[in-house]
A protein has these predicted regions:
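A feature for loop-to-transmembrane-helix boundaries and adjacent hydrophobic helices
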Residues: 1-254
Length: 254
């Protein structure tokens, strides 16, 4: 068993706290940008537009992630404490909400620049596992999105939460949604799937949703929501919708 007693604050600059969660976003975005610019983008026009697109992506991701968490997972709390919606540094981001925000931002940017939005969404899909990996590691450090009770040798006790031994579900997600997904999509990139805009995006939705759905069986449901239809979590139900969306999109791109 591992004892998790990490401090969510990485360090301080004067009186300003720099949290691991913030660093995860910064590192994930920076490495994703570098990966796209150095390895993925072959078209000169897209290369020139990509830096401006990143601004749209960041805004869409943060707004979508926060509003998604507010609406999907904790609406009553934030209606009672609306000012806390702005306190992103305290955690509380929905991946599915962030994804919706990124899709909207990509569509708006592409319309403005007269390009195919799937070109940018495919690049996001290929680089997103990098950010997901660091984000889940930050979740682990923050003792959030923790797993269900277990007696397995690699169980973790999140002492900031309780004294129960739990699955390190954040690390499961970092491995499958981060590392494995990165190499799976990289394989399809080498097969020239970028040639058909939207194919990589569809595959991302399919594989991410599969990984997320099954890992949710090891992750504790949000206490304010619990289990829903067929004893599934909200994350699983949303993953089913995203999987179906990805499968439908892939069928259109064949």
């Amino acid at each position: 068993m591992f004892i998790n007693n990490f401090d969510p604050v990485a360090f301080q600059i004067f009186s300003i706290e720099i949290r691991w969660y913030s660093l995860a976003y910064i590192i994930g975005i920076a490495l994703g940008w570098l990966y796209c610019k150095k390895k993925l983008i072959k078209d000169t026009h897209i290369f020139q537009l990509f830096d401006d697109f990143i601004t749209y992506l960041i805004i869409g991701m943060i707004l979508g992630g926060r509003l998604g968490y507010t609406l999907f997972y904790n609406l009553k709390y934030y209606l009672d404490n609306p000012i806390e919606i702005l306190m992103v540094w305290n955690g509380g981001m929905s991946f599915h909400g962030a994804l919706i925000g990124i899709i909207i931002a990509s569509i708006l940017f592409s319309k403005k620049n007269n390009t195919n939005s799937f070109i940018f969404l495919d690049l996001v899909a290929l680089s997103a596992p990098i950010g997901i990996f660091f984000g889940r590691i930050a979740n682990f450090i923050n003792s959030e999105l923790y797993g269900r009770a277990t007696d397995l040798p690699w169980s973790v006790q999140f002492v900031l939460i309780d004294n129960i031994k739990r699955h390190p579900s954040q690390l499961y997600e970092a491995f499958f949604e981060g590392i494995i997904l990165f190499f799976v999509l990289g394989y399809f990139f080498k097969k020239d799937y970028l040639r058909v805009p939207g194919k990589i995006s569809a595959l991302f939705l399919i594989f991410y949703s599969l990984f997320r759905f099954f890992i949710e069986f090891f992750r504790s449901p949000d206490p304010q929501i619990g289990y829903l239809v067929l004893n599934l979590t909200l994350g699983q139900l949303i993953s089913i919708l995203f999987f179906m969306t990805g499968a439908y999109l892939l069928s259109l791109k064949k």
